[in-house]
Each structure stands twice: as C-alpha cells, then as structure tokens.
C-alpha cells in the first residue's frame, strides 16, 4: 500500500515539474520574440486599428455640446446617452443665431487647423452592415399565385364537408391560375353564392325521395 502511494506521489511530482518547465520555456520564448508581443498588443485591443483613423473636425454643435453633455450627465447620472443627445439637440434648436455664432467661429478655426494638419484628408463615412438576404426567392409566377390563394382563403374559407365542395374548390383554383386578378372577387362571389344556394336548396321531390328512402324507426 505504501509503495502505491509513493509511486503516485512520485508521478504527481514529475507532472508538476514538467508543467513548471513548460511554463518557464514558453515565457522565455514570449519575451525573446518582439513580434509576438506586438501582435498581442495590436490584436488584443480592438481600438488600436481605429487610433490611426483621422477623426472628423468638430462642427458648431459638437463644440457646443462638448461641455453641455458633461453638464447634463453630471446632473442626471441615470440618463442614457441617447436621451442626452435628444435633449442636447432640442436645446441647440432653441438657441438663437447670436448665441450659436461663437461656436460657429470656433468650429471654423478647428477646421482650418485640421486642414493644415491633414491636407489630404477626405471624409469617408463608415458603411452600416446590411442584413443578409436569403438566396432562395420565389419566382414571379408562383409568388403571384400564392398571393391569390391567400386572398381567396381569406375571403372564402372552405370546409370540406362533401365531394361537391372539394370539386368546387379545385375548380376555382384552376380558374385562379389562368384568370386575371381584376375580376377575381366578382367571379368568386357569384360562383360561391350559386353553389351554396344549389347545394342547400333542393326541390320537394328530392327531399321526399330522401325521406322515403330512410327506414321507419319503431321504438321497442
């Protein structure tokens, strides 16, 4: 028993020593390779790629809202950034031209400094990611037929109670596929009214025949 425990302890000590040796070797390789450190620093922070991007010069509203936004955020710490922007936009519209003029002058000065510092600057707005469209699209003929079928099902819901109603529905589907969509409502309304009236309304002779065909019922 003691021999088994000693062998297990020895195996655990060997594994721990190998782990420490591997960590020391990997750290030495990491510090001795400057390109790997640069790759980690540049890829670790996603904003590094945007730091080289030249920012757009501020306009008059940006110059004015720079201090106002900080003031509103301190007064209302629970307010979201979108709500603060809406409030600042409303306050900017309420200012007069005389009140806006100093901020226009400051914006012109900042634009001149920006033009001297970056003479080749061109504003390139970031494009928004478009939603992916499905590759499978219905053809024009099938989509139009589908719209017609939905329209018919909405106007005239069928209940397949007998073979006559099934034949009527299939006959109307065949006519929908070859007819024009202008006179669909009138033709369907007339045909449905005709078939419903003929199926529900019968002659006295037909009713008498059905009644006489049924066997009499005698209670026991």
Curated annotation (Swiss-Prot):
Principal place where this protein is found?
nucleus
GO BP term, example? male sex determination
Q: Which PROSITE patterns match?
A: HMG_BOX_2
- Signal peptide residues are none
Q: Region (Disordered): which ranges? A: 195-220
Presence of keyword Transcription: yes
Molecular function GO terms recorded: calmodulin binding; DNA-binding transcription activator activity, RNA polymerase II-specific; RNA polymerase II cis-regulatory region sequence-specific DNA binding
Report the subcellular localization: Nucleus speckle; Cytoplasm; Nucleus
Q: Which GO terms describe its cellular component?
A: cytoplasm; nuclear speck; nucleus
User: Its function?
Assistant: Transcriptional regulator that controls a genetic switch in male development. It is necessary and sufficient for initiating male sex determination by directing the development of supporting cell precursors (pre-Sertoli cells) as Sertoli rather than granulosa cells. Involved in different aspects of gene regulation including promoter activation or repression. Binds to the DNA consensus sequence 5'-[AT]AACAA[AT]-3'. SRY HMG box recognizes DNA by partial intercalation in the minor groove and promotes DNA bending. Also involved in pre-mRNA splicing.
Family of the protein in this entry? Belongs to the SRY family.
Q: What is this protein called?
A: Sex-determining region Y protein
Organism name? Arctocephalus gazella
Q: Which gene encodes it?
A: SRY
């Amino acid at each position: 028993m003691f021999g088994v425990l000693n062998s297990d302890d020895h195996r655990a000590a060997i594994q721990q020593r190998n782990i420490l040796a591997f960590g020391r070797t990997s750290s030495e390789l990491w510090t001795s390779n400057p390109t790997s450190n640069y790759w980690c620093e540049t890829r670790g922070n996603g904003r590094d790629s945007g730091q080289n991007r030249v920012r757009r010069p501020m306009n008059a509203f940006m110059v004015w809202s720079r201090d106002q936004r900080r003031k509103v955020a301190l007064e209302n710490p629970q307010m979201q950034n979108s709500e603060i922007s809406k409030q600042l936009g409303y306050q900017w519209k309420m200012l007069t031209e005389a009140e806006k003029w100093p901020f226009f002058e400051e914006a012109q000065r900042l634009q001149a400094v920006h033009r001297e510092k970056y003479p080749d600057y061109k504003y390139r707005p970031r494009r928004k990611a478009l939603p992916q469209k499905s590759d499978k699209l219905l053809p024009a003929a099938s989509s139009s037929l589908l719209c017609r079928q939905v329209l018919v099902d909405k106007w005239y819901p069928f209940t397949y109670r007998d073979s006559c109603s099934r034949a009527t529905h299939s006959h109307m589907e065949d006519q929908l596929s070859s007819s024009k969509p202008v006179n669909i409502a009138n033709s369907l309304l007339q045909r449905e009214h005709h078939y419903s009236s003929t199926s529900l309304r019968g002659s006295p002779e037909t009713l008498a025949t059905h009644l006489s065909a049924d066997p009499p019922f005698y209670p026991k």
